Amino acid sequence: MAAEWASRFWLWATLLIPAAAVYEDQVGKFDWRQQYVGKVKFASLEFSPGSKKLVVATEKNVIAALNSRTGEILWRHVDKGTAEGAVDAMLLHGQDVITVSNGGRIMRSWETNIGGLNWEITLDSGSFQALGLVGLQESVRYIAVLKKTTLALHHLSSGHLKWVEHLPESDSIHYQMVYSYGSGVVWALGVVPFSHVNIVKFNVEDGEIVQQVRVSTPWLQHLSGACGVVDEAVLVCPDPSSRSLQTLALETEWELRQIPLQSLDLEFGSGFQPRVLPTQPNPVDASRAQFFLHLSPSHYALLQYHYGTLSLLKNFPQTALVSFATTGEKTVAAVMACRNEVQKSSSSEDGSMGSFSEKSSSKDSLACFNQTYTINLYLVETGRRLLDTTITFSLEQSGTRPERLYIQVFLKKDDSVGYRALVQTEDHLLLFLQQLAGKVVLWSREESLAEVVCLEMVDLPLTGAQAELEGEFGKKADGLLGMFLKRLSSQLILLQAWTSHLWKMFYDARKPRSQIKNEINIDTLARDEFNLQKMMVMVTASGKLFGIESSSGTILWKQYLPNVKPDSSFKLMVQRTTAHFPHPPQCTLLVKDKESGMSSLYVFNPIFGKWSQVAPPVLKRPILQSLLLPVMDQDYAKVLLLIDDEYKVTAFPATRNVLRQLHELAPSIFFYLVDAEQGRLCGYRLRKDLTTELSWELTIPPEVQRIVKVKGKRSSEHVHSQGRVMGDRSVLYKSLNPNLLAVVTESTDAHHERTFIGIFLIDGVTGRIIHSSVQKKAKGPVHIVHSENWVVYQYWNTKARRNEFTVLELYEGTEQYNATAFSSLDRPQLPQVLQQSYIFPSSISAMEATITERGITSRHLLIGLPSGAILSLPKALLDPRRPEIPTEQSREENLIPYSPDVQIHAERFINYNQTVSRMRGIYTAPSGLESTCLVVAYGLDIYQTRVYPSKQFDVLKDDYDYVLISSVLFGLVFATMITKRLAQVKLLNRAWR
């Protein structure tokens, strides 16, 4: 009988699944996806006027080709997100791109047109140092791979190993450079810090060591990043101690030659490590005799070393970035500098945005007061500036600086030099520039969106007419006649807006669909009828804030925080929504530095992206916890409480009205702190003088298990039904404790027989342990969702070697203790806890539950899979009350018979083929429709859509036949009128009889 009911259920479910799928005409109608590659690490641009792509490798372990005309991704390969997938080096030769990844363990060759893999080989173990192309007889044939102890030569066409040789004295010498220029030999250069340089020359054909030279360099610590090889194998190294350049011809010389810089009227910057920046356009030819010498953070010099003579071609005392590029026989140098005034790296920008902090990647550039830069080309042979090669561009965000410059040079029809420039800024913005007076910026890409750390959705404001109509209520001072006239004028304004909307619809209906432009303008943003269109406020790891319109993905505003350091943590809070007109909405961003522990507050308008006039408090101590209270000030802004490391409380805003409310509500304000290293959870309460008092403490032995996650409930969550009606018509009441915390622990012992996952349900007010359970032979990573009266968490079962879900549900029983008010201090009995586990056939990347405005709609779990798909799983499938043997009462409740396997159906994927690479999180928000939940999945890509867990029961479908129903209604009305007339005639005739 049970099997029969189970088969019936699965047949019923299978038939209903396609109804939740996306139809062909709905693709892209209410969803969108934006793909990114991340911060550029290496870039190679094709040098031809008709080139249509540029190949990049990024810090997100992505190799991709971008369309140079539009900036769109032509193809993309996403490697592992760990250090194993990191790209260590990249070289471009013809139509092939060579990459080395995984710390020098894997080398690949890619075809640049379609992104196909030509070949892949596994390299010998060892610390990777350098990669170079080796030419022979006017053609590039080999790839040289330099490691800590070996030098290997591989065939460019197949990747097969030609030879590998061990480097002499590799245990003490740090080999860091490899060089070849088609002469049949290849050099490996190593250094013993502050001692000497070792130069080993190998024969390309058989790998035999031809020559080995040792040169004393007591001032040199590193070769890479400081020295360079110029002209015909001449090693040039800057010597800050003697203020000179040291040169060594690798072919003929055995000792360094010193060339003082004073003879060229040049000087190194104090405390700055100078660098030599050479260029070798073709691996079969020698390097150019010209090179850049980086003297200070904003000082470059173009020098030439030829036949033992060093000469200054051009001095660039105020320069941001430089780059070389070659086309045909012409090699040019691109120089980026400020257009007018210059601001040093250590200066400050706008005080409201904080002061600059030095970043390792941006310390070698300067910033401009007006954020306007120019790029000019110079002929390297003479240092003469080429005419009509100036590109002037401006950066929108104050405080950001250019970090990298790549040049794409080509020859025009008149044999003059043309070029395009790829610029990457400090905030991970990619700009592709061209020489056009009308449109300098050909395209731009906001690659910081590849690393979103937190986001919130904010309702859009009402239109002016709607706001004026709302403002009528609650104002009786105008009198009856005044209110009537105001209502009349408001209705006329609404009628005018409706008429213009109808005219626009009629006008657009006459156009082809491709010509209809629905441009999103920040000045005309207004809430739609069902509140489906919202403002998405996103914060990225680089410290950049974005305002994105949710229905189209259009970036409406952006702000950059220049003093945010890497690995900082962020928390975004909405203090005031758009519901309190005329007060503007207000968001507060809390940024915490990981190293110092210090925090900063930034207050801004989430709709327009402007910094607020409200000055946030200056935080002088590290912040441990932040609380957004339901208490509001006189301007309807929620109060933010900040607790520092001395357990002192700071309120924002701290008006007299707020302090009075906090004084009254202090006994009912509780918070908790987590110290994962010590395994301590502490509960505190607020006193009336805004000090804190320890109310409870719980210690989990850190030598046995460590705290990995603490999950509370969403404060904006609504629960519609407080109980479940059972088969016998009794009610099983839910335990809806808003103060409940789900604490997940993991064993410190990594042995698969002794690992375990622990779950503790703790009351955050009293510290009472409501429930605890242990999953033996299990390990993380653990993903958890805590909502209403249930907790779902996922883990890896080491014994059965599979992923599993465990669901917990809490009930008070058939009698509700207090239906009007909840208090953690007045709960005599522990709730009943039901638990059940399920097998899931895949690991997961992220998990979240749907949420709606009133909580009436059924809940679904949105599960992000490693493949990039998002699975919408009904919570009813993870019900701990599912019976193994169905009974009459369970069938009455529509409980599904228990089956341990949770299957993945492709029809349940809400993003069909719009996969999200390397998904890190899923955000859900309610809309104005109870049936609709807004979903944003973010990772390397961003995907936004809508889901309907209980179908669209509150709105007509898109394919609703308005013409048919209208014609039927008109027909019925017409038939009623005719029937009425016929009945009157019949009655009249009957009366005359």
Swiss-Prot record:
Membrane association type: Single-pass type I membrane protein
Family annotation (InterPro entries): EMC1 (IPR026895), EMC1_C (IPR011678), Quinoprotein_ADH-like_sf (IPR011047), WD40/YVTN_repeat-like_dom_sf (IPR015943)
Major subcellular site: endoplasmic reticulum
Keyword Thylakoid: no
Cysteines joined through disulfide linkages: C227-C237, C338-C368
One CC-aspect GO term: endoplasmic reticulum membrane
Signal peptide range: 1-22
Subcellular location: Endoplasmic reticulum membrane
TM segment ranges: 963-983
Keyword entries, A-Z: Disease variant, Disulfide bond, Endoplasmic reticulum, Glycoprotein, Membrane, Neurodegeneration, Signal, Transmembrane, Transmembrane helix
Organism superkingdom: Eukaryota
Cytoplasmic side: 984-993
Residues on Lumenal side: 23-962
Subunit description: Component of the ER membrane protein complex (EMC).
Family, similarity comment: Belongs to the EMC1 family.
Disease as annotated in the protein's UniProt record: Cerebellar atrophy, visual impairment, and psychomotor retardation: An autosomal recessive, neurodegenerative disorder characterized by developmental delay, intellectual disability, hypotonia, scoliosis, cerebellar atrophy, and variable dysmorphic features.
Role this protein plays: Part of the endoplasmic reticulum membrane protein complex (EMC) that enables the energy-independent insertion into endoplasmic reticulum membranes of newly synthesized membrane proteins. Preferentially accommodates proteins with transmembrane domains that are weakly hydrophobic or contain destabilizing features such as charged and aromatic residues. Involved in the cotranslational insertion of multi-pass membrane proteins in which stop-transfer membrane-anchor sequences become ER membrane spanning helices.
Protein name: ER membrane protein complex subunit 1
Species lineage: Eukaryota, Metazoa, Chordata, Craniata, Vertebrata
Gene that produces this protein: EMC1
